[in-house]
Amino acid sequence: RQLDEKNWTLFYTKTNERRIVYTWNPLTICEKQNDEIHVIREITTPRLFKQLRGSSHGVHIDDEIWFLCHLVNYEDRRHYYHIFVIISAETYELIKYTQLFTFEREMVEYSLGFAYVKKDGQFLIGYSTNDNTTKYLIIGKDIIDEMTITHQ
């Protein structure tokens, strides 16, 4: 497997072992040992996931790991759309994902990462618009939960 990949996404297991999301379709979970990448798990995901690119690291929320990803649609210019992907912290199986969304309806938006503030039930999301701004959004987890589609 290729060692230099800009769209890899990192997360840690419950036992603090580093893992890599290598691709989103299939959801390919890897580990790095001695400069070699080893596939641990491959999981079937919706066809839409073929277009996903990593944006954020995985964030643990209870028994789930949340990722903020994006895809690029080349309509007349490139348009960025975002999606939260939620997997099981135990099995890495896909649990749910959100509908596609934008932050400001700008063509070029890129997520810089996010954090979850459990006591407030809110996400703090950093993002850029048109490759020349840095902005933050605070949004309730309940709002994101309303946007989710349960994977079957």
Can you annotate each of these PLM segments?
Residues 1-152:
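Beta-propeller domains
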